[in-house]
Structures are given as C-alpha cells and as structure tokens.
C-alpha cells in the first residue's frame, strides 16, 4: 500500500515521461463530504449548482469524485494508450480541450459503461489545468458500446476562476486507505474502499485501453 497518498497501487520499475497538470478547485471539491460540497456550491459562482439537495449531491459525487484518474493522466505513455484528445476551442476567454476514455463503473451489483471525460484549459502561464473530471453515461450504455463525447459542444462551464488551481505534484489524498489502483496495460482499475473496513469495495472504475486497429 502507498500510505503517502492513501491508495494502494501496483508500482512499476520503469520511469516514464510525465505530463504536468494543475487541478482546479472545482474538481478537488468532490472529495469532500456531501454536506461540505453543498455549502460550497450554494455559495459558489456557478448558478447551475446552487440549491441542489443532499441526495443530488451524493449522486453527483459518485461520478465526479475520481481524482485518482490523475495518476493515469500524468504518465504520458499510459495516458496516450487510454485517452483520446480532441481539438481545442475557445470559451469564456480561455483555450480549452478535452480527453476522453472508455470506462466501466461497478457499484452495488450494477455495471455501467461510461465515458471518462477530462476538461482542460490553458492557464495564465501556459500550463494545463484540469477543470472538469467525471464519468458521463452514454446513450448506448445498454448495448455496451461507447460513443463519441459531445462535451466540447455542450461545455456549460462559462467562467473558470483561474486562480483556484492546485499543483498536482504536491497533492496528497486524505488519511486512510481510500482506494487501490492496478494496471495490466489494457485496463487501469480503481477500487474505492470503505476506510472503516478496507475489505469492502464501494465502487470500481475500470478505464479501458484504446483498441488497436
């Protein structure tokens, strides 16, 4: 187990080139309790998130609280095997782009095929900042197929507070065992566990490698 970041991970001997990202506060907030998230959203600048019920926040937390995906994004070689990059576009005065991967979410005996979406923008000093990270259900979920993402077209984040970003290199997870991560080259798997009973798996995210043509 890697006690420094609260997750167990299969360590690799090789050294890979790393992507350097900062992570926006709107991504990191989903690691907090539903009650704290609700307070922040009610007082925040994004109107669409205000006055949500605790039940809604808990459901949204399930698909947004996946910051561990950053470990895969930072490894350039691994990232290129799993994520597809799209074209850049301008919105809210910032240059934005996205990365999309195929994923499977398992929780409570239910398995769903989803897209793992990453939204990025260019920071004031030219660095890349992750401001959006979530699972998004697909229209073809029942068939087990993953279609293309429309996130860029329907990006509803008009304004991004650029100063609210954290350098991921200094980020630490909360105390206790939050999850276990493993990778076999074709799948990157994150098992989220109950900190009070680490034998209990609460949910599992599996990100699938891009099929070779």
From Swiss-Prot:
Belongs to the UPF0329 family. This is UPF0329 protein ECU04_0110. Pfam families: DUF1609. It comes from Encephalitozoon cuniculi (strain GB-M1) (Microsporidian parasite).
